């Protein structure tokens, strides 16, 4: 998910990037600044709140449902959430969603007792089915898969090591964002308007594998996974091909926006997505996470019911290990500064009221 124009694994008792016994004596960071170890929830109720830093910088504040001003991560906990998801871009404009921004937000979340998912886009801006743009700093190597694999591995390791240095222990790591047609186009693109691209799958698997290996090297206990859009579709073919290329994944991440499919009701899309989640988990023997979900606040009561129905259904599927709302904290027509230059409107699936309180949509997580 990038924008909408106005229109996860049994309980893990150790943190995913754990320190060695006795390492406390080696840590010179003041204890009060180190997040406490966060237990990985059996079912993640989460939100991607990667826009928080920029929202706060523009003056936006947050409140609990009763109107009490509070830090956004405390607000999320008050809504029944136990996890957050944070994206990482390589060298973004203004630094938003860059490594440093991600680490700061992850540290705040961990200090609040929330488990953390890290979502690598491998781009300087949103990567999704419509665009998977090469990071500018990597362009000199964009025709050399081996060189790019090295850059991707180094970037992945650098971000995860920076998180570890702040005491943050990612529970889940996404290698790419909505990579149905690969990533790092055109090098690891899978098809174009002429059909399948020769060698595309092999290059994609090579680069995905570099990210997976880097994530496991730094965070051996983390759940590392690829991510596709459209949870309601039959996506088994895609994961079969990825496995055929020799790639590994510990889980599957999917996006689900039940009110955006033309010709289908939200209830139909929910039902199809839940069925597909069950079949994917059975086919590949891994858990499934809904890494993105969103509904439209313009029809708040109906949308709240749609989300609650989906989460209730997901909770009944043993292999479904979590649901994350995408950017629920957006309110009051706010949008990132860069959207203006792009001619984009505001994200239309925020789930907070005009004064910065969670709307009834967020009750679905309680």
Regions found by a protein language model. Give the residues of each.
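Acidic-and-aromatic substrate-binding clefts and catalytic sites of carbohydrate-active enzymes
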Residues: 55-56, 60-67, 90-100, 180-183, ...
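Substrate-binding cleft and catalytic face of glycoside hydrolase catalytic domains
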Residues: 74-200, 204-224, 229
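Bacterial Sec-dependent N-terminal signal peptides
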Residues: 3-6, 14-36
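Short, acidic/polar
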Residues: 59-77, 153-162, 233-245, 306-311
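Glycoside hydrolase catalytic-domain groove-lining segments
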Residues: 72-73, 221-223, 231-302, 312-315, ...
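Hydrophobic faces of well-ordered beta-strands that scaffold small-molecule active sites
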Residues: 45-49, 84-86, 116-120, 171-175, ...
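Boundary/entry segment of secreted carbohydrate-active catalytic domains
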Residues: 35-72
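Aromatic-rich peripheral "rim/lid" segments of glycoside hydrolase catalytic domains that contact
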Residues: 57-61, 282, 298-313, 317-366
